[in-house]
């Protein structure tokens, strides 16, 4: 029976439990990458549920095979990871620092607490569809020619070491084989058991036909099931971390008809990787669009977005290793800014003087509105005429002459 098929109530008294955020494996750019789960630590096993009344766990990890440490690479605060270098890494995050330290202490004790586990026990198990928004059904592996009987499969598994190499190499131990099972009584959904497959290189027979393994799924007696497991264990290399296994719950609920699963060859594996790359490129289109809009200073609707202070500072301050050149560049920028201000003031004066309907009243109104400009003009004349007092600057005689002429 699968370790995940246990309700939250059936676990009984837990060593530690609470709400934690778990990082999704397939999170889109705009959606939330973390989902909240009710996590329960029982002995050396860690379960997480969608809620406290769930009848089945969404995931399970056998902690003695993993290591627990803080996840400094995550941007989310109070994050930690449950890591295995050859299998998988799970990321969790707590609400605050106190809860994170509590979980690290409990999980660290559970990791060091070794339990007697069988070889065919699952290291971890997790539901494929974590979120309906981000769940994408993986294409089934292409089927090849299957063997006609279990005896042929055992012969293929017990062949010579030169001819016993598998015909497919997988990039990681996370790849799974999805068995399309037909339940006899309830007819419920298909389940997926996690199978850890060892990286290997393809090999061909002397005749020229590729050698492939066929896993036959059918109902067996207890003695036959144990013999099949022994044959499967003998076919794997000593370097494999976790052995391939099917839960007894799956095998007992299948019909007598035999469903053959064959490991795809290198060509089919490359096709699957190409499809995954295409899907990842399609998922990144929104991210590329957002970055291009951000570089062009545009909003998602196409409107012009005002530049931020950081962008203005970057565009203005461009440092050079030579300090003298930096001073000259800064002086040039200040002179350009002063020139633009003076051109603006000159344009305002020309607009006033070019007005054919200019009257004394309009000039007084313009003078009140542009008091700073007039003060700046007369302050520049002070060094040339040192006898002028500040009162004369505020009440210049030339402005009276202009008004009289008007």
Curated annotation (Swiss-Prot):
Keywords: Cell membrane, Cytoplasm, Membrane. PROSITE patterns: PH_DOMAIN. It is found in: Cytoplasm; Cell membrane. Residues 144-160, 243-259 have a biased composition (Low complexity). One of its GO terms (cellular component) is cytoplasm. The keyword Cytoplasm applies. Residues 118-173, 228-285, 383-406 are annotated as: Disordered. Residues 272-285 have a biased composition (Basic and acidic residues). This is Interactor protein for cytohesin exchange factors 1. It comes from Rattus norvegicus. The gene is Ipcef1.
